[in-house]
Swiss-Prot record:
It catalyses: 3-methyl-2-oxobutanoate + (6R)-5,10-methylene-5,6,7,8-tetrahydrofolate + H2O = 2-dehydropantoate + (6S)-5,6,7,8-tetrahydrofolate. It comes from Acinetobacter baumannii (strain SDF). Its cofactor is Mg(2+). Its EC number is 2.1.2.11. It is found in: Cytoplasm. Binds 1 Mg(2+) ion per subunit. GO terms for molecular function: 3-methyl-2-oxobutanoate hydroxymethyltransferase activity; magnesium ion binding. Catalyzes the reversible reaction in which hydroxymethyl group from 5,10-methylenetetrahydrofolate is transferred onto alpha-ketoisovalerate to form ketopantoate. Belongs to the PanB family. Its main location: cytoplasm. Homodecamer; pentamer of dimers. This is 3-methyl-2-oxobutanoate hydroxymethyltransferase. Pathway: Cofactor biosynthesis; (R)-pantothenate biosynthesis; (R)-pantoate from 3-methyl-2-oxobutanoate: step 1/2. One of its GO terms (biological process) is pantothenate biosynthetic process.
Length: 269
């Protein structure tokens, strides 16, 4: 089973690691067979599974249910679970809700924010809960951002994001996840923290790992497709097409053919 120590080792060795969202046991088993390194039970299930307009209505109970299903289907990947909207607004809530999803099978929890999360990260870490902090475009704050848009477009904004990363890493964050930021910034942050694995989605190909929503990479997105998405399913055929798509994603992350330049945001900072 992949562990946090393995992710750190991968980074030290320069080996890129793969991450996909997953919400059920059958997909989890296919990801195990494809040797996907990390699985994120994301609150994206609100849209991908429940058909909602955003992640905001997702509950801790939802997250625990899907975490348990994924864990039963996959004994290989590191399992990371989102704490959903407003479920870590207080330290008491953060501890209780982290306990719930960890007992369901998560090995790490993910929360969205910046430097203001430092105390929460510190308390969770001291209580034995590894924490991934999601920065850049954070979907739980979509109404604050005014939509799903590229973040840290200027040097000033990029430096603020770096300061946020520094604060949460110093507080004990085990992993960083960057979403929708310039490729240059993704590289800067990955290089700035040699002992902290950095996962990217729309953050360039210099981050240590890459994550996609499974429905997106299987071509099950109806409507606008994000720039950072590649449809790995259309390259496959036959009864093993889904498994082959997962294998292709894993291989493309490792050899850095994904994300290609067309999947990234090239902004001079």
């Amino acid at each position: 089973m992949i562990s946090l120590s393995d992710l750190r080792k991968f980074k030290a060795e320069g080996r890129k690691f793969s991450c996909l969202t997953c919400y059920d046991a059958s997909m989890a088993k296919a990801m195990e067979l494809a040797e996907i390194d990390t699985i994120l039970i994301g609150d994206s299930l609100g849209m991908a599974i429940q058909g909602r307009d955003s992640t905001l209505p997702v509950t801790v109970e939802d997250m625990a249910y899907h975490t348990a299903a994924v864990r039963r289907g996959n004994q290989h990947a590191l399992i990371m679970t989102d704490l959903p909207f407003m479920s870590y607004a207080t330290l008491k809530d953060a501890l209780q809700n982290a306990k719930t999803v960890m007992q369901a099978g998560a090995q790490m929890i993910k929360i969205e924010g910046g430097a203001w999360l430092s105390e929460t990260v510190q308390v969770l870490t001291r209580n034995g809960v590894p924490v991934c902090v999601h920065l850049g475009l954070t979907p739980q704050s979509v109404h604050v951002f005014g939509g799903y848009k590229l973040q840290a477009r200027t040097r000033e904004a990029a430096d603020q994001l770096i300061a946020d990363c520094t604060a949460v890493v110093e507080a004990g964050a085990a992993v960083l996840l960057l979403e929708c930021v310039p490729a240059q910034l993704g590289q800067e942050i990955a290089e700035l923290f040699p002992n902290t694995p950095v996962i990217g989605i729309g953050a360039g190909n210099a981050t240590d790992g890459q994550v996609l929503v499974v429905q997106d990479m299987l071509g099950l997105t109806f409507g606008r497709v994000a720039r950072f998405v590649r449809n790995f399913m259309k390259e496959q055929s036959g009864e093993t097409a889904i498994l082959d798509a997962f294998k292709a994603f894993h291989a493309a992350v490792q050899d850095q053919s994904f994300p290609a330049k067309e999947h990234t945001f090239q902004v001079e900072l």
